[in-house]
Amino acid sequence: MEWSEVEVHTTNEAVEPVANVLTEFGAAGVSIEDVADFLREREDKFGEIYALKREDYPEDGVIIKAYFLKTAEFVEQIPEIEKTLKNLTTFDIPLGKFQFVVNDVDDEEWATAWKKYYHPVQITDRITIVPSWESYTPSANEIIIELDPGMAFGTGTHPTTQLCIRALSDYLQPNDEIIDVGTGSGVLSIASAKLGAKSVLATDLDEIATRAAEENIILNKTEHIITVKQNNLLQDINKTNVDIVVANILAEVILLFPEDVYRALKPGGIFIASGIIEDKAKVVEEALKNAGLVIEKIEQQGDWVAIISKRGVE
């Protein structure tokens, strides 16, 4: 089989939307090469530094690589993929010195190239995300989330995913009921289930994402707790008295439904919102307040922000 590698050079702020667009066009695998990851010298829990070199990363910004089966249909789609990515600027997503390149790769090369950037990521002292192909021995009481990052965005490496998981770890209580809006790979739903949630409703508008989430949920043996639904945000979701709503999506999307979040939450319920770039945090904060939510805490990692708010106790 012949494969094509789509390489996009863009900004860190654009990582999630670009990865989502590439996935929606049918990418079989997506890798994210961010120099910040190298500079952090991420160590695993045994003190080993993964053997990636400085030259594996771009000088600045982020390179996103996606792999597509080279079919006549894909070749015809190439201009549309580039146009869709460039149109992200209409949502105020900065693309930086946007570059879009398509290369041919052989079967063996594509199957391994994107995997070298994914290794176990320790999110908290209790939670570690492990790629499905990695052999990993957990310590006592360690929560392991297995993911196939090739299927949808949400691998655990992005700061917004990590911020959400840490917030879930802080706020989720045993037997809580959770809604995960824009579930992507299902990572936040799986984390919720493994932290003790009684039930989780995972929604995503994208059919590819819901299928990916279902596969990852089965991989983690949490299908008895998590229900996946293809749905636009919280539209037509009649659940109320929910303990936590979590949404790791773009700030512009969060602005569309804070009133729906308020209605879904029980008094005292928590809304964890991330996917918010720093310069848009104030706008989101004001929208949450206007919907009746009370800001509980704001956390930041790099340029990314998570806002934790609460429905007041009436």
UniProtKB/Swiss-Prot annotation:
UniProt EC number: 2.1.1.-
Main location per the UniProt record: cytoplasm
GO molecular function, one term: protein-lysine N-methyltransferase activity
Intracellular or extracellular location(s): Cytoplasm
GO cellular component, as recorded: cytoplasm
A GO biological-process term: methylation
Binding, S-adenosyl-L-methionine: T161, G182, D204, N248
Keywords: Cytoplasm, Methyltransferase, S-adenosyl-L-methionine, Transferase
Classification via CDD domains: AdoMet_MTases (cd02440)
Name of the top EC class for this enzyme: transferase
Catalytic reaction(s) noted: L-lysyl-[protein] + 3 S-adenosyl-L-methionine = N(6),N(6),N(6)-trimethyl-L-lysyl-[protein] + 3 S-adenosyl-L-homocysteine + 3 H(+)
Function of the molecule: Methylates ribosomal protein L11.
NCBIfam families, alphabetized: prmA
Family, as annotated: Belongs to the methyltransferase superfamily. PrmA family.
HAMAP family on file: Methyltr_PrmA
Name of the protein described by the UniProt record: Ribosomal protein L11 methyltransferase
Organism: Listeria welshimeri serovar 6b (strain ATCC 35897 / DSM 20650 / CCUG 15529 / CIP 8149 / NCTC 11857 / SLCC 5334 / V8)
Designated gene of the protein: prmA
